[in-house]
UniProtKB/Swiss-Prot annotation:
This is Putative glycosyltransferase 41. Its EC number is 2.4.-.-. InterPro entries: Glyco_trans_1. Belongs to the glycosyltransferase group 1 family. Glycosyltransferase 4 subfamily. It holds the Pfam family Glycos_transf_1. It comes from the Viruses. Keywords: Glycosyltransferase, Transferase. One of its GO terms (molecular function) is glycosyltransferase activity.
Length: 328
């Protein structure tokens, strides 16, 4: 991944003894200007994080950081949200909102340029989202990756594939395709689909964290075929356990996953009812079939090498301590 020299990044710094992906300057600046530094440092005051939903991925992000969740964005220190929807929501209220927006999106921001507020207190979770908003003239302060909080469990590898995702407005996660392609290869019974489409075996947000990780651990490969991802936490969670992703090599996946990539064949804006417009990528079904067959016939040495690389990559996303986060 090529990084622009103009990007305000300083990776690998440490803040209060913990590894940080983001500029410590951003975090300290945000805390100091709100006159809360001493309280955070002493652990007296929890960081309040606004999330726009319940039982959703943004809520999980806040939980992994040990933030105190609020649904009042005017009372939040950090806002974990889709930046397109957030900036549309606060238009006209910019002077009343002070939170540091930590965002990722699958929407095509260009389509909503005139509907979004101008707001400079923003960091992104992925470089492709950073570049998307930079092109629109936003002064994004930096990039901080999402974190995971894995549970290391031991399970017999009795499944080949697993996937997890919730598709809204259209099948962005390609769950129906996963159901179809695994049936085509006669391995649907060796596949776990956690989601809301594709004849799912489990619903998305009704599993405990341990149950979710046990399903990951039972599988050899994670099918990460989403047409678009602002970041993409589930395959990274699976990677922490050595599960190898077979993934569309685009959007947030391109910078975050290691495993078996599938090249995208097209990139475009897809609109649902002329209201919800997403930046999406298609994949080659022919190449997908090739890589599914590759996974089914892979040798032990090759698999173990890919599995180790996946685990090594995922280590960079594990929060340094369960008592703190990069925002302290």
């Amino acid at each position: 991944m090529l990084l622009s020299s103009s990007m305000p990044l300083n990776l690998g710094k440490r803040i209060f003894g913990y590894n940080s992906y983001l500029l410590t300057d951003i975090i300290i600046y945000h805390i100091v200007i709100n006159n809360k530094w001493i309280q955070y440092f002493l652990g007296i005051r929890l960081i309040k994080a606004y999330v726009p939903c319940e039982k959703c991925s943004y809520e999980k992000v806040a939980e992994y950081e040990n933030f105190k969740i609020t649904h009042n964005l005017f009372d939040a220190d950090v806002c974990i949200d889709d930046p397109v929807l957030f900036l549309k929501r606060i238009k006209g209220l910019e002077d009343e909102v002070t939170c540091l927006l930590w965002g990722d999106t699958v929407y095509d921001a260009l389509y909503y340029k005139n509907e979004m507020a101008k707001y400079d207190n923003v960091i992104m979770a992925s470089y492709w989202n950073y570049q998307m908003f930079e092109k629109l003239g936003y002064k994004i302060k930096g990039v901080m990756k999402r974190h995971i909080k894995p549970i290391f469990v031991g399970e017999k590898k009795d499944k080949i594939f697993v996937t997890l995702g919730e598709s809204r407005y259209f099948d962005r996660k390609n769950l129906t395709l996963i159901d179809k392609i695994t049936r085509e290869f006669g391995v649907r019974d060796k596949t776990i689909i956690i989601g809301n489409l594709g004849n799912p075996d489990y619903p998305t947000f009704q599993l405990s964290e341990e149950e979710k990780y046990r399903l990951y651990a039972r599988s050899k490969f994670f099918l990460a075929l989403s047409k678009s991802e602002g970041f993409g936490i589930p395959p990274i969670e699976a990677m922490a356990l050595g599960v190898v992703p077979i993934y569309l090599d685009a959007h947030g996946y391109k910078e975050n996953l290691v495993g078996i990539p599938i090249d995208p064949i097209d990139e475009y804006t897809y609109c649902v009812d002329n209201k919800h417009c997403f930046r999406v990528w298609d994949l080659s079904i022919h190449e997908l079939r090739y890589e599914i067959n590759h996974a089914l016939t892979i040798g032990k040495d090759e698999y173990e090498d890919l599995s180790e690389k996946a685990k090594n990559k995922a280590r960079g996303y594990i929060i340094a301590t369960m008592e703190s986060s990069d925002f302290r």
